[in-house]
Swiss-Prot record:
One of its GO terms (cellular component) is plasma membrane. NCBIfam families: ispZ (TIGR00997), PRK00259.1-3 (NF001325), PRK00259.1-5 (NF001327). InterPro entries: YciB (IPR006008). It is found in: Cell inner membrane. This is Inner membrane-spanning protein YciB. Plays a role in cell envelope biogenesis, maintenance of cell envelope integrity and membrane homeostasis. It is a multi-pass membrane protein. It comes from Pseudomonas fluorescens (strain ATCC BAA-477 / NRRL B-23932 / Pf-5). Belongs to the YciB family. Keywords: Cell inner membrane, Cell membrane, Membrane, Transmembrane, Transmembrane helix. Its main location: membrane.
Length: 198
């Protein structure tokens, strides 16, 4: 479920982006809705609201959520400040590649792979399976970053659509594939190994 919370601001961004540009009165102020810049403002505000609500309810945010929020604030603010959507186009590639870097780093730093730190409380798997799973996430994030970058700078007319629905589609497909893979290997785990409950 956590993976899909990140898409709430993106969906709002998409809706505002698709609105035909218009000027509306908001609390006595004229505000332009529609297009990339008002959509970017909505993305920033909705991200602050969503992650702020999560922080209040959970008393913390995951590191991945902090990264997503900070990237949204930085790239979104640069987009508005310089009136250039180029900055926003780089957000998804940079975030995905930073995630990939974190998973890569866990092969060399720490006593457990990152995917095992994330999912180890719920699953008991042989170490080779954890390794393959971690590598799969690295490949996924590298591919998502490259795909977002390619579409953003090659297909101007559809990059926002891809940013939202392409990313969501790739995430769903990957999670389904991961589930199928895990279902084949859960029985390989040592049944005597205790599993920590939530």
């Amino acid at each position: 479920m956590k993976q899909f919370i990140d898409f709430i601001p993106l969906f709002l961004f998409f809706i505002v982006y698709k609105i035909d540009p218009r000027v509306v009165d908001l609390a006595g102020h004229e505000v332009t809705l529609g297009g990339i810049y008002s959509a970017t403002a909505v993305l920033i505000i909705s991200s602050l609201v969503v992650y702020g609500a999560l922080f209040i309810s959970q008393r913390k945010l995951e590191k991945s959520q902090w990264l997503t929020l900070i990237a949204c604030l930085v790239f979104g603010s640069l987009t508005l400040a310089f009136h250039s959507e180029t900055f926003l186009k780089w957000k998804a590639p940079v975030v995905n590649w930073l995630f990939a870097l974190a998973f890569i780093g866990s092969h060399f730093v720490g006593d457990r792979l990152l995917i095992k730190r994330i999912m180890g409380h719920a699953l008991t798997l042989p170490d080779p399976v954890w390794t393959r799973l971690n590598i799969a996430w690295i490949a996924f994030f590298l591919f998502c970053g490259a795909a977002n970058l390619f579409v953003a700078f090659t297909f101007q007319s559809i990059w926002v659509d891809f940013k939202v629905f392409g990313s969501l589609g790739m995430t769903v497909l990957f999670l389904v594939g991961q589930g199928i893979y895990l279902s084949r290997h859960l029985h390989d785990a040592d049944p005597t190994t205790p599993k920590t409950e939530d």
